[in-house]
């Protein structure tokens, strides 16, 4: 992902304020609610029958935290996202058979959650930088599918 120095600074500055536990669970929960067909990949998570069940599900929260942990790692390797996400790409492609379009959906949901949490601090410029990053991460995760 090519970011200007200003974009990189905007992304890393805001990310330093992100509560990965909270935002990860919320982003994954929203993905499962807004795009309910994604729930089929999480059948082992138990009750996903209602918005309250999804958003309160400890397995959703734990996996969301794990997802954002990997995303954080990616932010430290923006110049090598394909290498950083190679193993996760292989896992999601070969073993889990996740449609790579879902990575784009989750990235867009994450941007919405960040906007919700940071309000005016999440300026259009910050959003543009994050859109570049989530697109790059989605592309890296989809790499093994090609």
Curated annotation (Swiss-Prot):
GO terms for cellular component: haptoglobin-hemoglobin complex; hemoglobin complex. Heme b binds at residues 63, 92. Red blood cells. The modification Phosphothreonine is found at residue 12. Keywords: Acetylation, Heme, Iron, Metal-binding, Oxygen transport, Phosphoprotein, S-nitrosylation, Transport. InterPro entries: Globin, Globin-like_sf, Globin/Proto, Hemoglobin_b, Hemoglobin_oxygen_transport. Residues 2-146 form the Globin domain. Pfam families: Globin. The keyword Heme applies. The modification N6-acetyllysine is found at residues 59, 82, 144. The keyword Ion transport does not apply. The modification N-acetylvaline is found at residue 1. The modification Phosphoserine is found at residue 44. One of its GO terms (biological process) is hydrogen peroxide catabolic process. Gene3D superfamilies: Globins. GO terms for molecular function: heme binding; hemoglobin alpha binding; metal ion binding; oxygen binding; oxygen carrier activity. The modification S-nitrosocysteine is found at residue 93. Heterotetramer of two alpha chains and two beta chains. Involved in oxygen transport from the lung to the various peripheral tissues. Belongs to the globin family. This is Hemoglobin subunit beta. It comes from Macaca mulatta. The gene is HBB.
